[in-house]
């Protein structure tokens, strides 16, 4: 954290107090250079240890046209899971063959749209999707190039809502009960489907890297069984993302270097033990790419103290720009941006402005003495905040700026009141008769 001589918080060379004045609050602020540095770290750490690697940015973490363009400039591919994410990438100039299309319930419209634009890979989640892809590909005279998502039965120690690798999951085909093998044989028998590899994702916000080692073991052993039964060789192994980040002082995330050591070492070791050719290795970082490099600025309004109980501080945002506290009991660190050099003087709970008792941002956080009009900076809001923002209570979604070398640039304009009603319609014959 950088603080100038006035005690103001500085991000990307920009005074956050001035950012709040210029762009208004709530405001999402992203440190562009740090995002680029993280992209390069993922590429460098994995490519220096393994010959064939693709890094796919998990766009659900944070996606705008500018973000898509940045990812493309840094030489990464993109993990997408909707027509909207695909369209955003295309509008930013990303080539469709660099997009890998996820999703557990792709509709026929989704599939046709993906074929139309020339999607790179379909990440297949179930056997019904195989049938859909084969049929539509046949009608269009195309081939569906796929990677199958499998459930390896790995228990990652994280929040229940962001575990995905255990057997009881809505995602993927289970290996241990035979469902995955049946699906593979099904895929190999389809005329218009080309199977390239397997994918798994064991969860998010993971601090213990050992489950990645186990995931590699399970996935390659399964690939070896498939080879024995069908003669098919795995070309691509996608191990998803999930590396945790620091939200507060209790979080101890592992560095990218350690993840690269464990993953590449495991792939080489188990492939050698099984006498398999090394597959191309794919990773899908999202949160760890952008999470720590986003900060949300708020203006403090009312203060309410209940003696002997709690002191509430209200801000001009809340669950409409950050629903993760309500969804996951997420915890954050924060400072008063215009008093960033001062020591804490009081313990407060920061409440959002939505008409909802559960709209809280920070519980029992120690901050300097707070005055109306102060600017609150909440850290590590780069992932799944803008992405999950809503118009609840008809609040406008905030603006987003990239900051770099002392310069701030809009990448998303603040929504206007006109934007809120742009798609609303009152039918011409709408009356009580």
Predicted region positions:
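A charged N-terminal "starter" segment
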Residues: 1-145, 181, 185, 189-190, ...
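Hydrophobic face of alpha-helices
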Residues: 36-39, 216, 260, 377
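Short beta-strand segments
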Residues: 58, 145-151, 199-201, 238-240, ...
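Short acidic, glycine/serine/threonine-rich loops at helix termini
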Residues: 68, 91, 111-116, 133-136, ...
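Charged (often Lys/Glu-rich) extended helix/loop segments that serve as interaction or gating elements
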Residues: 262, 272, 276-433
